[in-house]
């Protein structure tokens, strides 16, 4: 069983966090004779499953070996977004002169205070995921290592929990990339980077996915020299290439050195500094750093669960094998969240947990594939997406029409000085059925839900053109894309008919 990192530093905020999500004085309850659900893992999927099932009257046990709240609360969404907000505050002051505001001297970052703020926010939010709160919701909380011991039993230390159904929600963890010398040199991951108390002079981020891009921008704005290394030809390989280009330009303006088509070959140490050797076009390049942060590489937490004993198939890279109903190969056992799903987001774990509750407790047949899943990368600007992109539509052989509104044509974006970005909506050719959208804007994550709602409700782009948006808002870009669809329907023949009618009625 792997050793989880210690929560550092030892201050009042982390003490409050631990008191909520892994109380040192916690006593596991006496187990019930039998549970409707035993949930293994108290990240987002586990917490939502446990609370939802208990709220419906089920007898539920929830087992967690480390910290309730999982990655999202402790080493993911919450601390990273706190850091990003501080970084954005710095950038706003830095760029204030663009708005006619003169700052007497260059803004300075107190990195220790930034991290202290993050820990304070995290401890405050942790009350929502606390052991005491879930106990009061009617969930039996067991702190300890869990493993299956029989067809309907789970062992937690010396305690046996008997279940009718079980749910595996143990999540995933960062893993070292196969880079020669990396382990010996040492590296940071999302599990350790938020324990920093002093600013890094030089940071290399390996991996240009969401985490890598977000933290590269944050640390650069907070005063570190940052190099972002990506093996593929674009950042955020899953995203629209136009969106990735805008983000690359934004990162470079902030001072991030972006290295695309660069493969990390090995790490060496010389005179106390870490040297990352890159394979790039035309040869090799060496980047010196104080620390290396891995922004790529995840592995499912399947070890120690004794899944073989209950016939649950799994892959050490992809996780627990599930069908569209989130059933494992043992029909009494389900899984949800990062342990089994390709889309490793907090909100998809939440949605999957709701599917599990219906299917495991009420003979439901809710399908994972029926979900419409948006996501957002919280850089500045943000990149939000839902449904298909142009590449995915082409791969699936789906003919599409694309309607794009540059933010440079949106009054609020111009007034805010945030006019770099766009709204791009894809519809099935010959119809107004929305199949996907990408938004690049400072608050794209807040905007994408309008398109997601339309897709879930089967509302076409034509209808969005009739929705009155307050003026001025950046969300008007969505209506403008819908207006472009409407104009496309005005064929020469229709326009000629309109002209003849108007001439006749003049």
Description of each model-found segment:
Residues 50, 54, 216-221:
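Gly/Ala-rich phosphate-binding loop of Rossmann-like dinucleotide-binding domains
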Residues 47, 213:
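Residues forming the Rossmann-fold NAD(P)(H) cofactor-binding site
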Residues 4, 40-45, 52-66, 78, ...:
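Flexible, glycine-rich terminal cap/loop adjacent to redox cofactors
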């Amino acid at each position: 069983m792997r050793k989880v990192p210690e929560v550092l530093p030892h201050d009042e905020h982390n003490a409050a966090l631990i008191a909520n999500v892994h109380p040192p004085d916690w006593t596991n309850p006496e187990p019930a004779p039998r549970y409707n659900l035993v949930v293994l893992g108290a990240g987002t999927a586990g917490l939502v499953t446990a609370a939802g099932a208990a709220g419906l009257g089920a007898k539920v046990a929830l087992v967690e070996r480390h910290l309730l709240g999982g990655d999202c609360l402790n080493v993911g969404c919450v601390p990273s977004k706190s850091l990003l907000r501080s970084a954005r505050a710095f950038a706003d002051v830095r760029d204030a002169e663009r708005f006619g505001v003169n700052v007497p001297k260059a803004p300075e970052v107190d990195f220790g205070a930034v991290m202290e703020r993050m820990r304070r926010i995290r401890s405050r939010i942790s009350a929502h995921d606390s052991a005491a709160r879930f106990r009061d919701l009617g969930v039996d909380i067991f702190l300890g290592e869990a493993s299956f011991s029989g067809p309907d039993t789970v062992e937690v230390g010396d305690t046996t929990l008997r279940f009718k159904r079980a749910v595996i929600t143990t999540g995933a963890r960062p893993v070292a990339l196969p880079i020669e010398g990396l382990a010996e040199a040492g590296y940071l991951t999302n599990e350790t980077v938020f324990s920093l108390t002093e600013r890094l002079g030089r940071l290399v981020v390996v991996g240009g996915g969401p985490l890598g891009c977000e933290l590269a921008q944050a640390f650069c704005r907070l005063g570190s020299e940052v190099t972002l290394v990506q093996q593929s030809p674009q950042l955020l390989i899953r995203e629209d290439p136009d969106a990735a280009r805008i983000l690359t330009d934004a990162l470079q303006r902030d001072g991030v050195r972006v290295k695309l088509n660069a493969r990390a070959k090995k790490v060496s140490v010389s005179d106390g500094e870490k040297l990352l050797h890159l394979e790039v076009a035309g040869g090799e390049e060496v980047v010196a750093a104080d620390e290396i942060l891995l922004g790529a590489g995840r592995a499912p937490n399947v070890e120690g669960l004794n899944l073989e004993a209950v016939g649950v198939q799994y892959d050490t890279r992809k996780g627990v094998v599930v069908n569209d109903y989130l059933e494992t190969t043992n029909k009494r056992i389900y899984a949800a969240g990062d342990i089994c799903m390709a889309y490793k987001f907090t909100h998809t774990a939440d949605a999957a947990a709701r599917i599990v509750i219906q299917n495991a407790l009420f003979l439901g047949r809710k399908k994972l594939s029926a979900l419409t899943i948006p996501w957002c990368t919280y850089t500045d600007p943000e990149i939000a997406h839902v449904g298909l992109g142009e590449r995915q539509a082409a791969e699936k052989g789906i003919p599409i029409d694309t309607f794009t509104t540059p933010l440079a044509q949106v009054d609020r974006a111009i007034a805010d000085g945030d006019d770099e970005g766009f709204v791009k909506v894809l519809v099935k050719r010959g119809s107004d059925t929305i199949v996907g959208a990408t938004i690049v804007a400072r608050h794209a994550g807040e905007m994408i839900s309008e398109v997601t709602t339309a897709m879930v409700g089967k509302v076409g782009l034509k209808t969005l053109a009739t929705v009155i948006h307050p003026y001025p808002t950046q969300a008007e870009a969505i209506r403008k894309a819908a207006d472009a669809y409407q104009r496309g329907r005005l064929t020469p023949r229709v326009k000629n008919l309109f002209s003849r009618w108007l001439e006749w009625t003049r």
